[in-house]
């Protein structure tokens, strides 16, 4: 989804063929892409919102971050010790590195979305598995945009944290 152009008007099949031709993906990667699942997502409400954000230049993909968090903050997010790769830089600070799949800015806040392909049976299972990660990523975005304002002049904050399960074909609020 990193290269997908939501506002192009092209079908997923056409876009995947173009990505292969432009060497953005390999033939092996193309073989793993399930076109109907991509089409379903792109035509969903969230996919359409992403298209609108893309048109206005406010869709951001694969954004890396490195940020320090206190142990208390990590505990509040639900991170237990050894649940992810963390680097302790001092007694008070742990350095977290991550890559945000996609986020976009709407008139009243930031929407954070993480794509998932896990084999799960329920939304709850996926939500519980990734809640801490999305809280942490949301806080990272809040810090990055702490001096920005939304269209109403309010501080720009993450307003929605979402997972999209390709397996379940669902957007899951977290």
Question: Can you describe what each PLM-predicted range is?
Answer:
Residues 73-174:
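Mg2+/Mn2+-dependent nuclease catalytic core
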Residues 1-85, 89:
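A non-catalytic, helix-rich entry segment at domain boundaries
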């Amino acid at each position: 989804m990193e290269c997908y152009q939501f506002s192009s008007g092209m079908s997923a099949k056409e876009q995947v063929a173009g990505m292969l031709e432009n060497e953005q993906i390999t033939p092996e990667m193309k073989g793993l892409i399930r076109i109907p699942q991509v089409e379903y997502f792109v035509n969903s409400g969230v996919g359409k919102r992403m298209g609108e954000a893309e048109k206005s230049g406010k869709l951001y993909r694969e954004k890396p971050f490195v940020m320090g968090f206190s142990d208390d903050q990590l505990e509040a997010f639900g991170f237990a010790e050894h649940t992810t790769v963390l680097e302790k830089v001092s007694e008070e600070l742990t350095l977290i590195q991550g890559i945000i799949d996609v986020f976009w800015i709407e008139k009243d806040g930031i929407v954070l979305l993480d794509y998932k392909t896990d084999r799960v049976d329920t939304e709850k299972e996926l939500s519980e598995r990734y809640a801490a990660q999305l809280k942490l990523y949301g806080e990272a975005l809040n810090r990055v945009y702490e001096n920005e304002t939304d269209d109403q002049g309010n501080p720009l904050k993450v307003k929605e944290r979402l997972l999209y399960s390709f397996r379940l074909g669902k957007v899951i609020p977290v």
